[in-house]
């Protein structure tokens, strides 16, 4: 209701975190509908591992998806370096900053990934470049690429399923000793507890 009352023609976009700060899964489809009815763009900030068990931002109608790549095999390294990711609908693709990776086939029919829309890059048109990538970011991107290739779709799904089931198990066990879970509805792998202790 709050969103319906506050989103109007003056709203540029609505951004939600899914799962949110407390671990809750938002009513993402409904939020997307409200946002689009107002003519605004819908942006979802997602935990990439959660996508193994919840719908993708595209399935919720998001125009843009963003997130932190740290859960994808990057160690916690005193605050960085990390990498972020950003994806958009094809209609919005040319408005994205940074380097865009596309899927293609080589002359032998093998799947490959390439940097696409190269005319936007520093080495082609420095004065109009929309990216600035340094070697640390490239190293993080390589590490995430290796992690994703190693895990595959089933590995990501298994990691997400284990994270969710273990969080729900912990929530149930904590409830036995007086810590009640405050989350309303479904949560992914984070949750809030309270206790009289």
Region locations from a protein language model:
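A generic structural motif
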Residues: 20, 151-155, 197
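Conserved PLP-binding catalytic core of the aspartate aminotransferase-like
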Residues: 179-197
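Conserved PLP-enzyme active-site core in the AAT-like
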Residues: 1-114, 178, 192
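Short, hydrophobic beta-strand segments
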Residues: 16-17, 146-149, 189-194
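Active-site C-terminal subdomain of aminotransferase-like
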Residues: 72-177, 181-184
């Amino acid at each position: 209701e709050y969103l319906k009352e506050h989103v109007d023609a003056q709203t540029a976009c609505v951004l939600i975190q899914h799962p949110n700060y407390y671990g809750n899964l938002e009513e993402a489809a409904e939020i997307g509908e409200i946002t689009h009815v107002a003519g605004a763009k819908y942006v979802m900030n997602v935990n990439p591992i959660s996508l193994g068990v919840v719908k993708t931002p595209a399935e919720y109608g998001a125009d843009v998806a963003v997130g932190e790549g740290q859960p994808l095999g990057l160690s916690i390294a005193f605050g960085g370096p990390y990498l972020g990711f950003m994806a958009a609908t094809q209609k919005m693709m040319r408005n994205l900053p940074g380097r865009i990776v596309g899927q293609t086939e080589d002359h032998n029919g093998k799947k490959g990934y390439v940097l696409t829309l190269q005319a936007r890059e520093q080495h082609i048109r420095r004065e109009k470049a929309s990216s600035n990538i340094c070697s640390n970011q490239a190293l993080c991107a390589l590490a995430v690429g290796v992690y994703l290739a190693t895990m595959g779709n089933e590995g990501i799904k298994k990691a997400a399923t284990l994270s969710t089931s273990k969080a729900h198990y912990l929530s149930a066990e904590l409830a036995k000793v007086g810590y009640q879970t405050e989350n309303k509805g479904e949560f992914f792998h984070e949750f809030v507890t309270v206790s009289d202790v």
